[in-house]
Design a protein with these regions (language model features):
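Single conserved hydrophobic/aromatic residue that forms the stacking wall/gate
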Residues: 1-11
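Conserved beta-loop-beta element that borders a ligand/cofactor-binding pocket
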Residues: 38-62, 71
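Substrate-positioning beta->alpha
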Residues: 64-65, 83-105, 112
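Short-chain dehydrogenase/reductase
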Residues: 1, 26-37, 59, 63, ...
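SDR active-site strand-loop-helix element
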Residues: 13-19, 53-55
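A short C-terminal helix-loop "cap" of Rossmann-like NAD(P)-dependent dehydrogenase/epimerase domains
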Residues: 69-83
Length: 215
């Protein structure tokens, strides 16, 4: 219905996909993203201009990646980490949105897929270590091999909240990196500590105030 309406109005389309999106990818998540890309290419090309953005992890103050792991790391003294050598090139949300805005009238980006990454490559373990450093806490991180990572996914998938699923595990079998496309300039280590540490410090301060009976 949306594509039909875009055809009628000839709206400029900016579609958010994912790095490694492919109908033949190992995970259903990446397959669905790939199918969506194909649908846009097959149905919009003749009617309006589109750009498909394919980012790695997108991070920022309210992100679901660093904030989720910071919450888990505060709770768990021992943290078994699946697929610790999987690679990512996280891109800062401000860099990505500015690039998307610049592309709206840029004809060189019309009807193209564009990978969008940050300037540096990190392993999953490095990102977890950076999260710990940002929170100024220490935890025992246990890197899991392929077999144990898959087992963890199967167990966690049946638990409430589904913190880690088999489909997540399959997605992690492909490194979320790219040597082409747009590269943001913001480094994870320069941005993430600002909001993780500030958030943690504020909540810790509020707890101390409550314990002391102060409002």
């Amino acid at each position: 219905r949306l594509i039909r309406r875009q055809r009628q109005m000839c709206i400029r389309d900016s579609h958010m996909s994912s790095l490694n999106a492919n109908p033949n990818a190992p995970s259903k998540y990446l397959q669905s993203k790939g199918l969506a890309e194909n649908h846009i290419e097959d149905n919009l090309r003749e009617f309006c201009n589109y750009t498909i953005f394919r980012p790695s992890i997108v991070f920022g103050e309210k992100d679901s990646f660093f904030n989720k792991f910071s919450t888990l790391l505060k709770i768990l003294p021992i943290f078994p980490l699946a697929c610790p050598e999987s690679k990512f090139m996280p891109i800062y949300v401000n860099d990505l949105t500015e690039f998307m805005i610049d592309c709206i009238l840029n004809r060189e980006t019309f009807n193209k897929k564009i990978d969008a990454t940050g300037p540096r490559e990190y392993t999953f373990r490095q990102l977890i270590d950076l999260t710990l450093k940002s929170l100024q806490i220490k935890r025992l991180i246990i890197p899991l091999n392929y077999t144990l990572s898959k087992l963890q996914a199967r167990v966690f998938q049946i638990l409430p909240g589904k913190l880690f699923t088999v489909d997540n595990f399959k997605s992690l079998q492909i490194d979320s990196v790219s040597s082409t496309g747009f590269k943001g300039s913001s480094l994870v280590e320069n941005i993430v500590p600002r909001y993780l540490n500030a958030s943690y410090s504020q909540r810790h301060f509020e707890k101390l105030r409550k314990k002391s009976g102060r409002k």
